[in-house]
Each structure stands twice: as structure tokens, then as C-alpha cells.
Amino acid sequence: MLSLSLGGQFMNNNIRVGSLFGIPFYVNPSWFLILGLVTLSYGQDLARFPQLSGGTPWILGLITALLLFASVVAHELGHSLVALAQGIEVKSITLFLFGGLASLEKESNTPWQAFAVAIAGPAVSLVLFLGLTIVGTQIPLPVPGQAIIGLLGMINLALALFNLIPGLPLDGGNVLKSIVWQITGNQNKGILIASRVGQGFGWLAIAIGSLGILNILPIGSFWTILIGWFLLQNAGSSARNAQVKEQMEAFTAEDAVIPNSPIIPAGLNIREFANDYVIGKTPWRRFLVIGADNQLLGVLATEDIKHVPTSDWPQVTVDSLMQYPQQMVTVNANQSLFEVAQLLDQQKLSELLVVQPSGEVVGLLEKASIIKCLQTSAA
């Protein structure tokens, strides 16, 4: 599976176990539960072979389970390596209760690049299925070995086919998203359609699982219901994210600038600054100092004026006390508000300086002002 923000509660408390091609590799505590269950199931099946005795079936069951999850990791690496080739950072690969997850920093730039990333995982699983099938049919192996190879081959086939279901958050949903994106030219429409299809499959899985538990259908179990719930939750999350993105893309950074941002002109003396901007005025403790051309010159903290005797305030100007803000990140006033919000989140910033293309300061922007902008537009 692929994700920009997938996982929810299942992705908490991950344990880092190393790196793969420079990609951080994690396992979620829920993975150990499924590892134990799979080992138990495979061990019981292998214990039926008379050639295997004692603890051998259980050791082979554990090895088979680990090879199964190695197949899942290979599937996720397929996504990840194609994404890396497109210059997209892969933040992590995680094994968890429902399989594996490759977490990408951002979307691909084009529909066909998105298609390539999405299809790479199932393609790897299909290649593994073909390779294991050839090994199992062409190379003489003990019967238990043939059973293990055959099982791994079929699991990889099932992994590919299940992930090709055309609904988010599955790979098939990302394939559908890229196709709709290519046809309509609208990425959000692709996400919304693939999310709705994913929700439909989620409800279908829940229905099948419920009917199976009631013995109305010969298939379906509690596990089917759990998978359906997972699909519903994450498809719904994808749809909501797409709607928020669509709303935010209608605005620019300038639209979300804080009204009356703390901007003061160079040449202002400390007495004027204190009277007009500080004493009984605003809660700001840091001000942007701009020149006659409205370009940023520096930043003045209110704490700095305490070092100047009050008798000297009329003679000392703010630009003589200011410091240049080396760490302040700027964005273009015309930049999409969605891109700006992503920058705030990715770099863990509290605020951004918004400037015109010519460099003129517009004001400050922060998460609260983005939320207020969206709420005002929705009212």
C-alpha cells in the first residue's frame, strides 16, 4: 500500500528495525500478533507431513511466515524504489497488522508517474509468484519444501490481486486515481472517486464478513469485517483530505496572512515604537522591520528595547537594534495555500513570512490563520 497520511491508530508506537536502501524500516507492535498467528497456522499445516517431527514444523512455520513478510517488504520496496527514481522521498516502510505501508513525502508530479509508483508493488508480487512457481515446478524438492514454495507463490499472487482492487487505500485505488487524473486533469477528482470506490469495497467486506459469521454465506469472518473497517476508515480519510486540498487550492498564501501582522518601518524611534505598537497594543513580542521599499530588513524583539535607557528612546531607531532573521522561511504571496500548509507541516514551522514576487513583505502566516481563512470562506 501507498500513503501520504495513512495508518491512524495502527501506526502508533512503531519500532525501527533498520534501513532498506536508505529508507527507515519499522514494524508496528500489531505485526507481532499476526506473525504469531501465521506461524501457528503454517506450523500446524506442516506438522501433517510425516517427514517433519518435533519442533521442526514450527521452526519451518516461523521461517515461512518471515518469508511471507519478506514478500510484503519486497512489494513495498517496489513502490518505494520507483518513487525514489522520481525524486520523491520515502519516509518509511512499515509492517503492521494488515500488511505493509510505504509512506511517501508527496504525490507524483504526473498521472503516469503516479501510475508507475502504484503498479510497481503488485508487479513485484507477480514476478515473485512467477519465480516461485517456476522453482516449485522445475526444481526437485522434498514435499514439505514444495509445499512452502507453493504457498509463498500463491500468497504473492493473492497479495498482487488483493492490492489491485480499485479502491483507496489499496494500490488499485491509486491506479484508478491516476487514470481519472489523466482523463480529467484533476488529481482531486481521482482521489475522491477512488476513495468512494474504496469505501464501497469496505462496506462489501463488512457485509460479507457479517453474513459469513451468521453462516448465511460460506465465506467471510471477523477478519473480513476488520479489513472492511480498515478500508472504510482510510478511504474516508483520503476523501476528506482531497476535499480539504481542493478547498485550500482556491486560496493563496496572501489570503491567509494574519491581519495587522507585526510590521514596523525602519527609522521609527524606540519611543514611537513603544507607544504605537507595544504598550497596550498587541501581544506580539517580535516585529518585522521593513525599509522604504517594503523589503524585509530585520526583526526586532520587544525584549531588546529594555537594554536602551528610556531617556535615549527618542534618539534610537528600531533598525539599529534589529537582527537579521536567518531562520525565517519565506513563501510567495501567490503560492497555493495547500503547498504552504504542507511546508508548515513538513518543516514543523510555527509561521512563515509571506512576500510578493518583488520581495515586498505582505505579512506573517501561521496554522491558525490558515484555519481562520478556511472557516471564513465556509461561513
UniProtKB/Swiss-Prot annotation:
Its EC number is 3.4.24.-. It is found in: Cell membrane. InterPro entries: CBS_dom, CBS_dom_sf, Peptidase_M50, UCP006404_Pept_M50_CBS. It is an enzyme of class 3 (hydrolase). The active site is at E76. It is a multi-pass membrane protein. Its main location: membrane. Binds 1 zinc ion per subunit. Keywords: CBS domain, Cell membrane, Hydrolase, Membrane, Metal-binding, Metalloprotease, Protease, Repeat, Transmembrane, Transmembrane helix, Zinc. Pfam families: CBS, Peptidase_M50. PROSITE patterns: CBS, ZINC_PROTEASE. The chain crosses the membrane at residues 20-40, 54-74, 115-135, 148-168, 212-232. Belongs to the peptidase M50B family. This is Putative zinc metalloprotease sll0528. It comes from Synechocystis sp. (strain ATCC 27184 / PCC 6803 / Kazusa). The lineage of its organism: Bacteria, Bacillati, Cyanobacteriota, Cyanophyceae, Synechococcales.
